[in-house]
């Protein structure tokens, strides 16, 4: 029973705790009511106003009748209201994955404050041996135990063995990677698939770290440089090649990680300041097949002249070469065996990529994805610093002879003749769409495939030409021999959202009406999966033109009234489904009711009409979902030819795009005394507007959109069916204000990095904002294995075979702008012991009488 004795010994502290909690509840209620009133005014939910008034009323009642339980009854009504409202909204969103996080954020702070207040009141107003006290203690203990049980049940764990025979029947050919991995995507087809199956679903639980390598290159020389190597190692012959954020190249022993040689191009620091991230996604490998006993190069074409340059210093003809591109505009040829510069390439071993570019600042345009080797050519695109100026450096793509370094062709949206040489003093057209990602090629078709970005200013295009719009956010097929355009497919018409092509095009065969055709699949930031005929660009699966919003169009700009949508495959830009996700107030989230309400206010103030909401100069801007990260990005897609599955990881993270009239933009662009790291507003010079486009985060530095913020999904390429999808990543290494929660509960984080698919029935991936590498069963999505990484794994996973053993490798160097832990590691895994099957998955037979060695 509740005592009327106000001076019961030892109870005063509980009384003060009760009053303190009710005071906090009152402050919380005041904030909720104030924000809630504004939300109602803006056309949103009444919940925050109603709950806030209840909490304020209960707090005032506690001050007036502090010895009575009536305030707790009012608080209890607020809790019940919150619970009902939460379930109604969460159910209205169809119980999205990670809905438990949504529920916890809605209820958590209110329940904790009310619970502590109620506990303190009971201990204040009841005798020491009261049954009410015992009941309260029991309830608290039971609640904590239940919470711990729920956390334990939802703790991410690998399930171990999936099936007795993990290897799938491979339909692979030499088009897929085997013991070697000679390109970013395994081969120039970009499948990120390996025929190796020694590691499979039946034994992946036994995968252990075999070795790791530290380059020492993880501390930028300046604070204005953002490191993220994003490197996928290349395996060719008996060497593994990797490069770092500052473009140091290392050749390693594939079995031990021992450094066989290293090369430091000594990149000037000022050339890295203009980069979004200082990255070296891959080196390029070329083998001209001239050396006796060496394999032929992947990609010699008879119609490309094979002219060998002068013999380089070092006693070798550089028949096998590794190429690295640097931010200061050098394409350097290195002997793959010895690591010295191949002097017969270009000028003393170097091709000057700044030639014809008219750069105003070092690094303004540079290659960060590596060259693609095909047809005896090195095909080189480049990133151009986003949103600096309309007359930014050209987006030209150039092809050089891999032996001599001679320029063979140069493709640009505004240069129809790719064979034309520049006149003395002439430069390539400024501001044209660039190709910053990994280029694919199919030598059987004689084509290279370019995924393009935008012209010099992403979010206003009133002064773009029709040709620039045609080749923006497009897949362009060019002739390998001449560089001439064969076909182009625009994925976003008149792109004003920075939905450039990030993912590498993927090539494979499909059967259409009983006829096998070479297809190209392109994943986009907007979430579409387009399947095109690789020879003609014709859509092989339905693509329809959907009407898109036109209201709020910026003066002088032009928008397309429709946008292409792939309707055969699910959209992978938000919650996976047949159409792009549309959010409303129910999807807005916060760690507490206060930041959640603030995010709701922002949502209702901003323009949002779904995908392709036009950029606006409205005071609060517009919500961009998917954001500039995507959707699908530079990690690329994985393709399993046996199971006919495309594996895609993607982010679900919104940005705010706020256009600023030129008079309000003080920042200077790169090339005119400006520096990208110093810009709060991207200047967009040469247009009427600057642009601010931060991620949409709350005051706790977490997204204003309820999780999941990242997924991995498998789609059948023949039927279009979404086979499985699941959130990718936990909150273990992230949290409010960037403080790790150490909760390994799947919520789905933003992710950058590529999958690896193997004929062992496995999909390996890191990419998420927690520092883990994972292996999923490709057929089902079940998590079978995971391992902790020493830093962020924002890179592509690869695999290779060496001396009878399969290895799985991931670069763990983190991503400065993604706020994952930085490092300098390459981590390599393999099966332990001598019982491993051979590289194709068959168990290795021991000789009769063979003995196990060691313990």
Regions found by a protein language model. Give the residues of each.
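Cytosolic juxtamembrane helix and N-cap/initiation of the first transmembrane helix
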Residues: 2-28
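Aromatic-anchored segments of alpha-helical transmembrane domains
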Residues: 27-33, 77-90, 147-148
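Membrane-helix interface "capping/anchor" motifs
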Residues: 60-74
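Cytosolic-side transmembrane helix boundary signature
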Residues: 111-143
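Internal/C-terminal transmembrane anchor helices
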Residues: 130-158, 637
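Blade/loop signatures of beta-propeller domains
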Residues: 159-212, 413-418, 587-618, 682-686, ...
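Repeat-blade elements of multi-bladed beta-propeller folds
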Residues: 181-185, 225-248, 274-330, 363-389, ...
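Extracytoplasmic/lumenal domain signature
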Residues: 205-218, 249-276, 286-297, 331-362, ...
């Amino acid at each position: 029973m509740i005592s009327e004795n106000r001076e019961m010994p030892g109870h005063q502290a509980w009384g003060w705790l009760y009053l303190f909690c009710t005071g906090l509840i009152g402050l919380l209620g005041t904030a909720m009511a104030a924000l809630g009133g504004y939300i109602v005014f803006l056309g949103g939910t009444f919940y925050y106003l109603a709950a806030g008034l209840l909490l304020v009323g209960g707090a005032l009642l506690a001050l007036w009748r502090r010895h009575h339980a009536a305030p707790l009854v009012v608080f209890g009504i607020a809790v019940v209201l919150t619970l009902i409202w939460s379930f109604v909204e969460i159910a209205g969103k169809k119980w999205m994955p990670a809905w438990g996080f949504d529920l916890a954020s809605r209820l958590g702070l209110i329940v904790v404050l009310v619970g502590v207040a109620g506990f303190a009141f009971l201990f204040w107003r009841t005798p020491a041996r009261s049954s009410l006290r015992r009941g309260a203690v029991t309830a608290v203990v039971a609640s904590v135990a239940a919470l711990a049980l729920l956390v334990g049940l939802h703790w991410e764990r690998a399930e171990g063995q999936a099936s007795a025979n993990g290897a799938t029947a491979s339909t692979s050919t030499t088009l897929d990677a085997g013991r070697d991995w000679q390109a970013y995507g395994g081969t120039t087809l970009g499948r990120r698939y390996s025929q190796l199956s020694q590691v499979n679903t039946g034994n992946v639980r036994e995968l252990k770290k075999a070795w790791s390598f530290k380059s020492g290159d993880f501390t930028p020389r300046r604070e204005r440089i953002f490191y993220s190597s994003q490197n996928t190692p290349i395996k060719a012959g008996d060497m593994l090649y990797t490069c770092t954020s500052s473009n140091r190249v290392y050749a390693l022993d594939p079995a031990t990680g021992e450094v066989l040689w290293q090369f430091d191009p000594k990149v000037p620091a000022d050339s890295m300041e203009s980069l979004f991230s200082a990255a070296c996604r891959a080196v390029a490998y070329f083998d001209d097949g001239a050396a006796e006993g060496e394999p032929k190069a992947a990609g010699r074409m008879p119609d490309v002249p094979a002219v060998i340059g002068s013999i380089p210093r070092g006693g070798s003809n550089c028949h096998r070469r590794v190429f690295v591109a640097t931010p200061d505009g050098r394409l350097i040829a290195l002997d793959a065996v010895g690591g010295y510069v191949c002097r017969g390439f270009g000028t003393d071993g170097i091709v000057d990529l700044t030639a014809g570019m008219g750069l105003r600042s070092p690094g303004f345009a540079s290659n960060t994805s590596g060259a693609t080797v095909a047809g005896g050519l090195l095909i080189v695109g480049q990133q151009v610093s986003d949103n600096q100026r309309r007359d930014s450096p050209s987006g030209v793509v150039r092809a050089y002879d891999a032996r001599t370094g001679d320029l063979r062709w140069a493709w640009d949206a505004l240069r129809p003749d790719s064979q034309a040489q520049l006149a003395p003093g002439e430069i390539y057209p400024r501001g044209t769409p660039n190709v910053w990602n990994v280029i694919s090629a199919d030598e059987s078709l004689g084509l290279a495939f370019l995924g393009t970005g935008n012209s010099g200013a992403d979010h206003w295009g009133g002064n773009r030409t029709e040709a620039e719009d045609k080749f923006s956010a497009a897949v362009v097929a060019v002739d390998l021999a001449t560089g001439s355009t064969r076909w182009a497919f625009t994925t976003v018409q008149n792109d004003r959202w920075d939905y450039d092509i990030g993912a590498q095009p993927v090539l494979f065969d499909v059967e259409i009406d009983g006829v096998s055709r070479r297809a190209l699949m392109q994943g986009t930031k907007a979430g579409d999966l387009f399947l095109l005929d690789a020879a003609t660009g014709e859509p092989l699966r339905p693509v329809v033109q959907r009407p898109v919003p036109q209201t709020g169009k910026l003066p002088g700009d032009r928008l397309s009234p429709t946008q292409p949508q792939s309707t055969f495959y699910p959209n992978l830009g938000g919650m996976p489904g047949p159409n792009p996700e549309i959010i409303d107030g129910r999807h807005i989230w916060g760690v507490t009711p206060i930041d959640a309400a603030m995010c709701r206010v922002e949502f209702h103030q901003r323009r949002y009409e779904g995908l392709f909401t036009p950029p606006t100069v409205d005071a609060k801007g517009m919500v961009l979902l998917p954001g500039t990260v995507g959707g699908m990005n530079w990690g690329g897609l994985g393709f399993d030819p046996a199971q006919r599955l495309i594996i895609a990881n993607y982010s679900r993270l919104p940005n705010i795009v706020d256009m600023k009239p030129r008079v309000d933009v003080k920042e200077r662009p790169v090339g005119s005394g400006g520096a990208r790291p110093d810009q709060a507003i991207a200047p967009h010079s040469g247009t009427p507007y600057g642009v601010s486009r931060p991620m949409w985060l709350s005051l706790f530095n977490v997204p204003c959109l309820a999780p999941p913020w990242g997924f991995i999904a498998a789609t059948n390429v023949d039927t279009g069916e979404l086979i499985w999808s699941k959130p990718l990543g936990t909150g273990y290494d992230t949290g409010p204000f960037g403080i790790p929660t150490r909760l390994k509960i799947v919520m789905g984080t933003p992710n950058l990095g590529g999958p690896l698919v193997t004929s062992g029935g496995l999909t390996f991936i890191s990419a998420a904002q927690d520092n883990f590498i994972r292996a999923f069963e490709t057929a089902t999505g079940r998590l079978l294995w995971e391992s902790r990484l020493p830093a962020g794994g924002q890179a592509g996973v690869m695999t290779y075979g060496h001396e009878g053993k399969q290895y799985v490798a991931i670069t763990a160097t983190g991503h400065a702008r993604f706020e994952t832990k930085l490092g300098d590691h390459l981590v390599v895994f393999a099966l332990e012991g001598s019982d491993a099957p051979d590289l194709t998955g068959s168990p290795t037979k021991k000789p009769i009488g063979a003995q196990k060695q060691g313990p």
